[in-house]
Amino acid sequence: MSAKIIRIATRQSPLALWQANHVREMLVKQWPNLSIELLPMITSGDRFLKDKLLSAGGKGLFVKELEEALLDKRADLAVHSTKDMPAQLPDGLSLAAICKRDNPFDALISPQFKSLDALPKNAIIGTSSLRRQSQLLAYNPNLQVKTLRGNIHTRLSKLESGEYQAIILAAAGLERMGLAHHITQLIPDDIMLPTCAQGALCIECRTDDLEIQELIYGLNDPISALCVHTERRVNAKLGGNCHIPFAVYCTITAENLLLLRAKVLNLDGSQMIDDEQQGKIEEAEIIADRCTESLMTKGAMTLLSTIPS
């Protein structure tokens, strides 16, 4: 490996910086003589934190500037929460590594109520996710969902101020930031199925940069990568992004089979189309396509067409 300085592009949020430093530490552990610098950046998504993701332009806004830094070679790699990645990457860029997946589930946080079932009628729940909103209302239509934006600490502060009676956040982010003590309940996946790739960090680099790909090869977790890419395949075929209430989650069973579950909902959770597929690990792409085709046959695209663009 050459002696050049490796530059990691990252957002400037506390969670993003933690994630970039985590990757840096793993790289230095494997390559002790490596020199690594972080390149913190403010993304378009960070500038729109007070707006709904839907109106601001979607999750791709959180990676656009980082990808531009890769393409113009200001950075050698970028660290992302894989759930923030659009289904399609720009030409010339690849997801070269999926790190071992952390907690994929959603967490309820409430200073007053100990579970979703304990929430009173008309309780105000904060989230910026249409997926969470739809599944919450499908489970309990008597809840009120209110948009919640900002980084983790901002969202927790809004909860503490009394603006919400509970909020929903990704458990992985809370755990990475040492804030797991705030978690009131890990929401079971039969109530709230995770979003595509939730809990997994990814490393993006230039497709033709074989040196960087060799460098990060050891950070790729094969099982996590298999599950994440299977989820992303379904997501891509459905045109998935944060504009639609769509959930997909892939796991490996005790019998070493691939289990894939997905669901599409309307905004108020009154309509839901779901599917479950299982099969051999080596047939992951076939299973993903079978799941997609089943959802479409059941009317997923018709249901999604009712979601405002």
From Swiss-Prot:
Catalytic activity: 4 porphobilinogen + H2O = hydroxymethylbilane + 4 NH4(+)
GO biological processes: protoporphyrinogen IX biosynthetic process
SUPFAM superfamilies, alphabetized: Periplasmic binding protein-like II (SSF53850), Porphobilinogen deaminase (hydroxymethylbilane synthase), C-terminal domain (SSF54782)
Cofactor remark: Binds 1 dipyrromethane group covalently.
Pathway per the UniProt entry: Porphyrin-containing compound metabolism; protoporphyrin-IX biosynthesis; coproporphyrinogen-III from 5-aminolevulinate: step 2/4
Disulfide links within the chain: none
InterPro entries, per the entry: HemC, Porphobilin_deaminase_cofac_BS, Porphobilin_deaminase_N, Porphobilinogen_deaminase_C, Porphobilinogen_deaminase_C_sf
Modification type S-(dipyrrolylmethanemethyl)cysteine: residues: C242
Cofactor(s) the protein requires to work: dipyrromethane
Gene Ontology MF, one: hydroxymethylbilane synthase activity
Keywords of the record: Porphyrin biosynthesis, Transferase
GO cellular component term of the entry, any: cytoplasm
Enzyme Commission number(s) of this protein: 2.5.1.61
Family, similarity comment: Belongs to the HMBS family.
Miscellaneous field: The porphobilinogen subunits are added to the dipyrromethane group.
Function: Tetrapolymerization of the monopyrrole PBG into the hydroxymethylbilane pre-uroporphyrinogen in several discrete steps.
Subunit structure: Monomer.
NCBIfam families (alphabetical): hemC (TIGR00212)
Protein name: Porphobilinogen deaminase
